[in-house]
Amino acid sequence: MRTLLRWCLFLSLCVSCACAFMFSSMREKTKESPGKVPCGGHFRIRQNLPENAQGWLGNKWLWLFVAIMIYVMLKFRGDGENKEQHPPGLRGCQLRSPPKKAQNISPSKDFTFNTLTQLEMELVKFVSKVRNLKVSMATNSNSRQQVPESPTNLYNNVTIYEIWGEEDSE
């Protein structure tokens, strides 16, 4: 329902702006006197429009309609958000506690958190490999030696606390 309302509003706004743009060029004022105007080899009679005739953009009813449609669209959008935040069973009863925020975590936030956790783990692995490579270079061992995926020296691994500069590493 809301999608249909939004598309109707958008379509009506586009049509009204297109008509205003097309017909505004026809209303441009010319310096010719009203009355008979030469057109080809013939004379045509120009209609005398009153001085205060309004174009499409000057029509106050059109702007009122557009403002009302925008208000209605925003009102429906606000109702949809309120329904998502407060379940219908809890609306009338104020004695119950609101739903817990942990239950309302959206899948996109959960995905973002998981992605950041994976990136953090990859950063720890990368820094550990760099540190192991530095140690092997400092001890003048063979520089062509491959750094294993799971290092044998577990005490040489970097923790996330060392990366972020926190001294308390457990």
UniProtKB/Swiss-Prot annotation:
Compartment(s): Nucleus inner membrane
Domain of life: Eukaryota
Residues annotated as signal peptide: 1-20
Annotated disulfide bonds: none
Keywords per UniProt: Differentiation, Membrane, Nucleus, Signal, Spermatogenesis, Transmembrane, Transmembrane helix
One Pfam family this sequence matches: FAM209
GO cellular component, one term: nuclear inner membrane
Region of interest (Disordered), ranges: 83-107
Tissue distribution: Predominately expressed in testis.
Membrane topology term: Single-pass type I membrane protein
Residue spans crossing the bilayer: 56-76
Alphabetical GO biological process terms: acrosome assembly; spermatid development
PANTHER family (alphabetical): PROTEIN FAM209A
Subunit structure: Interacts with DPY19L2. Interacts with CYLC1; the interaction may be relevant for proper acrosome attachment to the nuclear envelope.
Function according to Swiss-Prot or TrEMBL: Required for sperm acrosome biogenesis.
Name of the featured protein: Protein FAM209
Gene this chain is encoded by: Fam209
